[in-house]
């Protein structure tokens, strides 16, 4: 497949800017970096709630770190497997994907995602990665109707779950709850895919693929009865971005938890050291035998050295492998961790999930977040032409007139809010305390 096809944009551009010698992917990176959606990540929850501490990561700092790790993966792959250099010809592609990968995540992290998915249960669902695709291709006002108007290859790379909602959603949904406060997140997991409202754009992205490649790329599998189906494949660029995201989540969120005293050295010893000291890889055995001495040291530079050692260990354990069944090179090859390091990364991810994500104090914040989001959605849908801001009202009215999914407009609006703005808006709507109009002067 010729490179020019993957460089194409949905809306042709003839911008002639003074002395602008950037390539298409450098332009994509700039559009993402300078977007309002990217800036809002500075006030969105990563794991720990915004405002809990000045040290921890937000979605913005997480995305910057993912970008650094992603470019590091690309650099070491170019050295390690130079035969793939033609496919790794642009650092800006990887930077773009890593910077953009969380743009669609709503306020209050996973709690906000569950809340919007529940409120959209009869209207195509909600999921953060699907919303990222939607922001890049429709919502961000770089163009009037085409979002950021990014290159086809960039959009292919952002597709972590390349299949429509309707093909993946389980047949028998759970019964709705009588009151929002009874909602259990485990019963309403989002479908990881693209919204059916955006199928025409997905078709455009996949247009260069052969019929066989497209069919295979869109395929899914059943995990277990009663669960949503899952997609199987992703592009090479996406596989690099996803590895960078996983490494940042496992290692840097671990660092936040250690610094804030959320996890103890004994918990680390029980759940990580005892497992990875028996790893099949000698490097992992040796490092994890003594890693706790540095990770939990009172000397900050020792902890930082341990974190850097972990990141470097994972980045240098990645190789490009062939994926059977594809002709298109961007799909035929994926980056993957060596098996022992893949196990180690999953051990770290499970440790963070068990002792950080599932910590009652964190779950209380998540619970509060999904109550706020659901009550905002209920208010807006009750009287959209009265409560929605003017720009969003216009989109809602146009959607109604055209017979489109108007609920999606409200999901778009709420998902774009920062944690603080959503909480403040909720207070203005539902708290007896009065507030000024100026405090709510925020259009997306």
From Swiss-Prot:
The record's listing under SMART domains reads: HDc
The HD domain covers: 59-250
SUPFAM superfamilies per UniProt = HD-domain/PDEase-like (SSF109604)
Please give the PANTHER family that the UniProt record associates with this protein: DEOXYGUANOSINETRIPHOSPHATE TRIPHOSPHOHYDROLASE-LIKE PROTEIN 2 (PTHR11373:SF40), DEOXYNUCLEOSIDE TRIPHOSPHATE TRIPHOSPHOHYDROLASE (PTHR11373)
An annotated Gene Ontology molecular function: dGTPase activity
Protein name (database record) = Deoxyguanosinetriphosphate triphosphohydrolase-like protein
Say which family it is in: Belongs to the dGTPase family. Type 2 subfamily.
**Is the keyword Hydrolase in the record?**
yes
Q: Does the keyword Hydrolase apply?
A: yes
Please cite one Gene Ontology biological process associated with this protein.
dGTP catabolic process
Q: NCBIfam families in the record, alphabetically?
A: antiphage_dGTPase, dGTP_triPase, PRK05318.1
Q: Which UniProt keywords apply?
A: Hydrolase
């Amino acid at each position: 497949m010729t490179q020019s096809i993957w460089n194409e944009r949905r809306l042709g551009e003839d911008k002639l800017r003074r002395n602008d010698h950037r390539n298409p992917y450098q332009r994509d990176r700039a559009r993402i970096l300078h977007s309002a959606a990217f800036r809002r990540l500075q006030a969105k929850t990563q794991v720990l709630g915004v405002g809990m501490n000045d040290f921890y990561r937000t979605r913005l700092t997480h995305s910057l770190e993912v970008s650094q790790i992603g470019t590091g993966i690309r650099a070491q792959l170019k050295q390690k497997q130079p035969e793939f250099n033609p496919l790794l010809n642009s650092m800006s592609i990887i930077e773009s994907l890593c910077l953009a990968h969380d743009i669609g995540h709503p306020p209050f992290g996973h709690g906000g995602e569950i809340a919007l998915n529940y409120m959209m249960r009869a209207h195509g669902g909600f999921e953060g990665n699907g919303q990222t695709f939607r922001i890049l291709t429709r919502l961000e006002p770089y163009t009037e109707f085409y979002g950021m108007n990014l290159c086809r290859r960039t959009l292919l790379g952002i597709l972590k779950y390349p299949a429509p909602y309707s093909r993946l959603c389980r047949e028998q949904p759970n019964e709705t709850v009588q009151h929002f406060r009874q909602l259990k997140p485990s019963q309403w997991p989002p479908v990881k895919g693209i919204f059916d409202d955006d199928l025409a754009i997905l078709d455009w992205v996949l247009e260069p693929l052969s019929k066989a490649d497209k069919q295979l790329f869109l395929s899914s599998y059943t995990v277990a009865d009663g669960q949503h189906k899952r997609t199987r494949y992703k592009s090479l660029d996406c596989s690099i971005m996803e590895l960078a995201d996983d490494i940042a989540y496992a290692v840097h969120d671990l660092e936040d938890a250690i610094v804030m005293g959320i996890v103890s050295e004994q918990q680390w010893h029980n759940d990580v050291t005892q497992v990875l000291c028996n790893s099949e890889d000698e490097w992992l055995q040796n490092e994890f035998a003594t890693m706790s001495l540095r990770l939990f040291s009172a000397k900050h530079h020792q902890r930082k050295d341990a974190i850097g050692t972990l990141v470097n260990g994972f980045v240098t354990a990645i190789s490009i492998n062939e994926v059977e069944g594809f002709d298109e090179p961007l799909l035929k090859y994926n980056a993957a961790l060596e098996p022992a390091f893949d196990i180690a990364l999953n051990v770290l991810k499970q440790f963070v999930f068990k002792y950080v994500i599932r910590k009652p104090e964190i779950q209380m914040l998540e619970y509060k977040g999904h109550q706020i989001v659901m009550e905002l959605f209920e208010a807006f849908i009750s009287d959209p032409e009265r409560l929605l801001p003017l720009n969003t009202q216009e989109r809602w009215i146009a959607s109604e007139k055209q017979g489109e999914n108007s609920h999606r407009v409200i999901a778009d609006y709420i998902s774009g809010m920062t944690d603080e703005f959503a909480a403040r808006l909720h207070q203005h709507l539902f708290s007896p305390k009065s507030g000024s109009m100026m405090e709510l002067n925020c259009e997306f």
